[in-house]
A protein has these predicted regions:
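His/Asp/Glu-enriched, well-ordered alpha-helical/loop segment
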Residues: 287-370
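N-terminal signal peptide c-region/cleavage motif recognized by signal peptidases
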Residues: 22-24
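Active-site core of metal-dependent hydrolases
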Residues: 189-312
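Divalent metal-coordination and catalytic microenvironments
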Residues: 38, 58, 80, 91, ...
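C-terminal cap of metal-dependent C-N hydrolases
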Residues: 38, 360-414
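Histidine-rich, glycine-flanked metal-binding segment
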Residues: 29-33, 40-86
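Metal-associated gating/positioning segment near the N- to mid-region
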Residues: 69, 73, 77-143
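Divalent-metal coordination cores built from histidine and acidic residues
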Residues: 109-194
């Protein structure tokens, strides 16, 4: 046999072995999890159709009409369910101080206790901490939480609930901006809250901090007066991209005495002010929301204002607020967008709120129940609805964080129990 023929023969054998290795590797499951046959709603990627979603290494690996189940180690049947990016709630209160000052009010909740069961993977604490106590908030709340916790930093240095909401001496734009620049991974903007006057120091300092740090401001507008009104707020004070939360509260003349929508709301939208729900304990009423919808004025984003005084009233949780927006007439894709891609853009986190390939696999699997339901506003007034959103499963970084009906679990009869001391028989004791 000639040398050239021998080399050729060896090359062909090597190629054959290589092909076998590649074939064997391709036959092995390489996705960690496959969500099969769910209806994907992803506003960023303009998907509103049945798709399979594959997850690998905690990230979205593929979104396609058909993915072979043999490629995944675990397959979840999502047929009849909606698969969306993990929900984003940009108005919550989750800061329990490690050393609260005397007389401080504490209405915050544990983020992990109320996020995943509602499909929420990211929350934004809306001003519970200020520049003076942000380090405590970061160390004791943000770091240990499994939920992604971000923050609007209160322009009041001592934060919310400490009795300083109306103390202009506590409002330091430079200090707030400095803390924001030092913590860009957590702080997404500034919060002005509950200020009752006189003047505009809370708004002005929050906006100044926003300009210094290049970040938006969220406003929970306090007491209105002849001088302090939403006309001035929207036309003279806030910037495009700033957020007016509690947009259907009625406390700031969002509707007029004749029941019609205040034209200032429309003018604010023209200036690209963001209008956020912020349901809360006393900030969402049908008598405001219905005229707004009749005028074609819809919210930009849906949030809860989650705290101990709101969670058991009309608000309940984010998917309940989303169900209320369905009852008002918004179609499901819009409602999903208002709780995913829209808030992600508002807080300038484009890596969130979508199912981009390579994105962290924060995912909600939702069921839309059909029937006769009642949605309550903050006064307890009821509006009938025919659809209600239920969270079946939540994934955080590709790991199951909530599974209402065990979609990702084995049947107990085939489940391999790891029997520890608790399972020892009497004979072994």
């Amino acid at each position: 046999m000639s040398y050239s023929i021998l080399v050729y023969d060896l090359d062909m054998r090597s190629l054959g072995i290589l092909m076998l290795v590649i074939s064997a590797a391709m036959a092995q499951p390489h996705y960690d999890l496959l969500l099969k046959g769910g209806h994907v709603i992803d506003a960023r990627n303009r998907i509103d159709d049945v798709r399979d979603v594959a997850i690998e290494g905690g990230r979205v690996a593929r979104v396609a009409p058909k993915i072979d189940p043999s490629e995944a180690r675990k397959v979840v049947d999502a047929a009849g369910l909606y698969v969306t990016p993990g929900l984003i709630d940009i108005h919550v209160h989750v800061y329990k101080r490690s050393n609260p000052p005397p007389g401080a009010q504490d209405e915050s909740v544990n983020p992990d206790a109320f996020s995943f069961r509602s499909g929420v993977t990211t929350v934004v604490d809306a001003g519970s901490s200020g520049w003076k106590d942000f380090a405590d908030f970061r160390d004791h709340i943000v770091k240990p939480a499994r939920t992604r916790v971000l923050a609007f930093l209160n322009i009041v240095g001592a934060g919310m609930g400490t009795g300083h909401d109306n103390d202009a001496a506590e409002m330091d734009a430079e200090a707030a901006a400095r803390i924001a620049k030092e913590n860009p991974d957590v702080i997404v903007g500034f919060k002005s809250a509950h200020y009752e006057g006189p003047g505009w120091p809370s708004i002005d300092n929050a906006v100044k901090a926003g300009n210094l740090a290049g970040l938006p401001v969220m406003v929970d507008f306090g007491q209105i007066t002849k001088e302090r009104n939403i006309d001035t707020l929207f036309l003279d004070k806030l910037r495009p991209g700033d957020i007016f939360t509690h947009c259907f509260s009625g406390h700031r003349e969002e509707t007029l005495e004749n029941g019609k929508l205040n034209p200032a709301m429309v003018e604010g939208r023209k200036r690209k002010i963001i209008f956020d729900i912020g349901f809360g304990a006393a900030s969402f009423y049908w008598y405001v929301a219905v005229p707004a919808y009749q005028a074609g004025f819809y919210p930009d984003s849906i949030s809860t204002d989650l705290h101990t005084n709101s969670m058991n009233g009309g608000m309940k949780n984010l998917i309940n607020v989303m169900s209320a927006i369905l009852a008002l007439g918004s179609p499901l894709p819009d409602v999903i967008r208002m709780a995913t891609w829209a808030p992600a853009q508002e807080i300038r986190r484009p890596q969130l709120g979508n199912l981009d390939v390579g994105a962290e696999a924060d995912i909600a699997v939702l069921r839309v129940e059909k029937g006769h339901f009642g949605m309550l506003d903050s006064a307890g007034a009821r509006m009938p609805g025919t659809e209600r959103i239920v969270c079946e499963m939540t994934l955080r970084k590709g790991q199951v964080a909530w599974d209402l009906n065990g979609l990702a679990s084995e049947d107990w009869q085939s489940f391999h129990y790891r029997k520890g001391p608790y399972f020892k028989s009497q004979k072994d004791k």
